[in-house]
Design a protein with these regions (language model features):
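Short intrinsically disordered terminal tails
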Residues: 1-2, 98-101, 162-168
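Charged, amphipathic alpha-helical stretches
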Residues: 2-37
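Acidic, low-complexity, intrinsically disordered interaction modules
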Residues: 25-152
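Long alpha-helical solenoid repeat scaffolds
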Residues: 3-7, 14-17, 48, 89, ...
């Protein structure tokens, strides 16, 4: 099962760009703090990273966040982006499974694993109303951000080619 830093390493570049663009525009303090933290970790001056062209800066951020040492940062960035930019996707998935959630699609405790068939019924409509690459990232993050995850979801993530995180 991929961990949050693995998800960053494997997600398609277009999704990485979406994520960092969202953070830069909507979560500027978090974005700048992330740059500062990662630059210091790599013994770089923050201004050196911050002044890079956006595309180059985002490639650098992805490479650094994708390292094992940055597992916590990767998990936090995924959570902020998914809840902030894709709450509808989260809600649609949980509604499809009949799981109660707040208006942002977050839950306090993970309920017992649904059947594989129930998961398929909840996931299938997501591909018609949401970016399929974002659906794949969300489901991998959903699985990775809980210590146990759901075995039935782990099987689907491994079997369904639409849910693969092949970075191009």
């Amino acid at each position: 099962m991929p961990t949050p830093h693995d998800i960053f390493a494997q997600m398609p570049p277009a999704v990485v760009e979406q994520l960092f663009s969202f953070l830069e525009q909507k979560e500027k303090p978090l974005y700048m703090t992330t740059i500062d933290t990662l630059a210091k970790q790599r013994k770089l001056r923050t201004i050196f990273v911050a002044r890079k062209p956006r595309a180059e800066r985002n490639v650098w951020l992805r490479e650094v966040v994708a390292k094992n040492i940055n597992e916590g940062i990767a998990a936090h960035l995924l959570q902020i982006w998914l809840v902030g930019a894709h709450a509808k996707l989260l809600c649609d998935f949980l509604d499809g499974l009949g799981i109660a959630h707040d208006e942002n699609g977050t839950i306090e405790t993970l309920p017992p694993a649904p059947s594989k068939d129930a998961l398929l019924k909840a996931i299938e409509p997501l591909f018609t109303t949401h970016d399929p690459a974002v659906v794949a990232v969300y489901l991998h993050a959903f699985q990775a951000l809980d210590d146990q995850g759901w075995p039935s979801l782990a099987e689907l993530l491994a079997e369904d080619p639409r849910l693969q995180l092949a970075a191009a």
